[in-house]
A protein has these predicted regions:
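Generic N-terminal initiation segments characterized by hydrophobic and/or small/turn-forming residues
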Residues: 2-4, 36, 236
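Intrinsic disorder/low-complexity signature
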Residues: 8-9, 19, 54, 213-215
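Active-site beta->alpha loop and helix N-cap motifs at the rims of alpha/beta catalytic domains
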Residues: 22-175
């Protein structure tokens, strides 16, 4: 498997120095992994949210040692209303003070960046003690590269910490995988403490890890690649939907990696 990955990387240029990428040299054994697991929002047969099931799942995730992520795509962030989002936050806050939550702004192509709505969503999350994960939107990603970075900086000024989220447009029409120039700019925003990467392309994530290691080692690259959960070997942490099925198993994997 490692040999196959090396062949894949041969034609991929490094994010630092432009040399061919060598992912094998990036493997980081005995590293403590930061695991965040997106919580599924379950529904009953009558269409009501199964809040008892939701709470039990949050509790199970916390007991396993992972931080829950609520109101993400696994929690139908783009389909639920503010009342449902707020209830999910309240129930999560009752179980843990270590959690993140999606800040989603629904818009249409051609609309401008809606900073006010992002800030409103962020305030709801922060009031419950969570860290906002900034979902992309048409207004955010359609801007110039300089304006994209400036928008994240504006949001970060109004929070103790935020997490970014790159989403491939194969998943959502507003999604965008940023250029490495944009990513470099994001690394310069102090209160942007990490970013989830969901391109499903190892080489893109390897490039981000290299750039992170060079520019800002404390920045978290959260893999969102459910098809390559071994990206933690190379220095990624994770914010995954797949882990919602078995948070205890992911936690055991993480512990085994940390101890070698």
């Amino acid at each position: 498997m490692i040999r196959v990955l090396a062949l894949v990387a041969r034609n991929t240029r490094s994010a630092v120095g432009g040399k061919p990428m060598d992912p094998i040299s990036m493997i980081r054994p005995c590293r403590k992994i930061r695991g965040i697991s997106a919580i599924l929002l379950p529904f009953q047969s009558n269409g009501d949210v199964d809040w008892a099931g939701f709470t039990a799942h949050v509790r199970r995730t916390v007991a396993a040692g992972l931080a829950p992520a609520v109101n993400m795509d696994t929690g139908y962030a783009h389909l639920i209303d503010d009342a449902t989002r707020t209830r999910a936050l309240e129930l999560t806050q009752a179980e843990t003070d270590d959690f993140v939550a999606g800040a989603f702004v629904g818009d249409q192509p051609g609309e401008t960046f809606n900073a006010d709505e992002y800030l409103r969503q962020m305030e709801i999350i922060q009031s419950a003690g969570g860290v906002p994960v900034i979902f992309q939107s048409h207004g955010l990603t359609a801007q110039s590269e300089e304006s994209v970075v400036a928008s994240y900086a504006q949001l970060a000024e109004n929070a103790d910490a935020i997490i970014g989220f790159e989403l491939s447009d194969v998943f959502a029409p507003f999604g965008k995988i940023y250029s490495l120039d944009v990513y470099h700019g994001l690394l310069g925003i102090e209160r942007l403490i990490g970013s989830k990467h969901s391109s499903l392309k190892r080489e893109f994530e390897w490039q981000r890890l290299q750039l992170r290691d060079e520019v800002r080692p404390d920045f978290c690259v959260f893999t969102g690649n459910d098809l390559a959960i071994d990206m933690v070997m190379y220095g990624s942490d994770y914010l995954l939907g797949l882990s919602t099925f078995a948070p205890d198993v992911f936690a055991k994997r993480d512990a085994a990696w940390a101890t070698g």
